[in-house]
Amino acid sequence: MRSYKLIAPAKINLYLEIIGDRPDGYHELVMILQSIDLADEIEIHSLSSETIRVHCNHPQVPTDKSNLVYRAAELMATKFPEAFAKYGGVDITVHKHIPVAAGLAGGSTNAAAVLVGIDLLWNLGLTQTELEELGSILGSDVPFCVAGGTVIATGRGEQLSPLPNLDHIYIVLGKYRSLEVSTAWAYKTYRQEYGSTYLRDTNDLASRAAAVHSGSIVKAIVEKDAVAIAQKLHNDLEKVVLPSYPQVLQLRELFASQPSVIGTMMSGSGPSVFALCENQAQAEQVQQQVRQTIPDEDLELFVTRTITHGIQVLGNE
């Protein structure tokens, strides 16, 4: 019975700007997405029967059709029925290390790993572009999670333009286990409060995306200047999430007050907050200081770093 083990990295947003509405109900976005070393492990085994099974070590993660992992396997079975019939179903085990409901694309990266794993398991020979296109059916973050590294994402987040890779910028990441922020609520609230500023013309949308691509944060990424990147971090959703979630604001302010932190921001729609540091020792020092200041066991703190890849295959049996 064949099987594959894959690594599925989390992502953070270095930049998130909401620039308009879309006919499909989503928003027009300009984002800079970055893979980090915090990752889940996915094991995929072939089954003799045409069934899909999902297991997970985290009690908050469902294992039915509401899980994006299940839907990714179901999508592959639907798109490639002959391979599904020939090779059988799949048994998928998710070993969670990425915090759940954290704005770190944990579900999306797990789904991306399933697409990559089933492609290998069924000998489909799909290209990365084809895998990204399948991922876009599942969710806006899935194409990026397939690709990984450092990219500008536009549209609803599925249109990717690679940037020079950023490696070994150290990060302290914090997330309250019991705290969740609804992504739908965050975007809906932003639309209600700031929708009057949205760009309406498609040429204006394209121009704004191009301006970010040629702007100062991308220049800093090209030059691998961590301090300059940290100074240009931007997330529009902070405007609605921080006033409504005092714990997220408190954590962000505490990170910002640390001398070794060169920049801090909420990732995605939250509630995760990250801080950039110039080296691992400083990141570990910040983690220790924040833990002493907020001894609450509900607060998870991780030291991680930027990486240059998306889904990785560890091996097969």
UniProtKB/Swiss-Prot annotation:
Residues given in the record as ATP binding sites:
P99, V100, A101, A102, G103, L104, A105, G106, G107, S108, T109
Q: Which pathway does UniProt place it in?
A: Isoprenoid biosynthesis; isopentenyl diphosphate biosynthesis via DXP pathway; isopentenyl diphosphate from 1-deoxy-D-xylulose 5-phosphate: step 3/6
Does the keyword field hold Ribosomal protein? no
Please give the superkingdom of this protein's source. Answer: Bacteria
Q: Record's SUPFAM superfamilies?
A: GHMP Kinase, C-terminal domain, Ribosomal protein S5 domain 2-like
The positions flagged as active site in the entry are K11, D141
- Enzyme Commission identifier(s): 2.7.1.148
Task: Identify one Pfam family in the record.
Answer: GHMP_kinases_N
A GO term (biological process) for this protein? terpenoid biosynthetic process
Q: Which UniProt keywords apply?
A: ATP-binding, Isoprene biosynthesis, Kinase, Nucleotide-binding, Transferase
Cite the GO molecular-function annotations of the record: 4-(cytidine 5'-diphospho)-2-C-methyl-D-erythritol kinase activity; ATP binding
* Gene3D superfamilies per UniProt: 3.30.230.10, GHMP kinase, C-terminal domain
Its family remark reads: Belongs to the GHMP kinase family. IspE subfamily.
What function does this protein fulfil? Catalyzes the phosphorylation of the position 2 hydroxy group of 4-diphosphocytidyl-2C-methyl-D-erythritol.
Identification of the protein by name = 4-diphosphocytidyl-2-C-methyl-D-erythritol kinase
